[in-house]
Regions:
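Short loop/turn segments that flank or connect secondary-structure elements
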Residues: 1-180
């Protein structure tokens, strides 16, 4: 593996037994594909990868936000927080990997969401709709701006629950491609 792929990571922060990306991510790459919410065929039982040294470049190059954002505490490791934090050109994405209402309304999540919105950092969430279908993505900044400014924890939690309920009802595409 090229050391440049890990030069931006927080020193000493390792995945350990966390396998959130190996299970929950949808991977569609020329070199490798894996459905969302299914364990990768190369994953070992207690975490880790059978082909770690030869794993596809898409796996070598990707890291959750916990691995490269030093301001995130150890509680933010996905298997501990219940949220896989991703980052892309559009900002930070909260992808709950456990019960979305519980994970997204935790004080840990609300502190980061509130701080991000207050600083103008684009935030979104990716909420599962139904088994076998893609998650629904939704921006958090505009719908949460007013309640974040109110600094009312119950108001923020209630608004997040409303947004999660809305997302869960959305029609999304099947994870499995169908021939037309």
């Amino acid at each position: 593996m090229n050391e440049d792929n890990e030069s931006h990571l927080v020193p000493g922060r390792e995945c350990g037994e966390c396998t959130a990306c190996c299970v929950h991510l949808l991977i569609k790459d020329d070199e490798f594909e894996k459905p969302a919410d299914q364990a990768c065929s190369h994953m070992v039982e207690k975490g880790g990868c059978k082909i770690y040294n030869d794993r596809p470049s898409v796996c070598q190059d990707w890291h959750c936000a916990w691995r490269f954002m030093p301001q995130l505490t150890d509680e933010w490791r996905p298997d501990r927080s219940g949220i896989l934090l991703r980052s892309d050109e559009n900002g930070i994405i909260f992808q709950p990997i456990r019960e979305p209402k519980k994970a997204m309304t935790s004080s840990l999540a609300i502190e980061l969401i509130g701080g991000g919105i207050a600083q103008g950092i684009p935030l979104s969430m990716s909420i599962p709709t139904r088994k076998g279908y893609l998650s629904h993505g939704m921006s958090l900044n505009e719908p949460l701006q007013e309640v974040v400014e109110s600094r009312s924890l119950p108001a923020i939690q209630n608004k997040l629950i409303d947004l999660i309920k809305f997302s869960k009802k959305q029609k999304t595409d099947s994870i499995i491609a169908t021939d037309s």
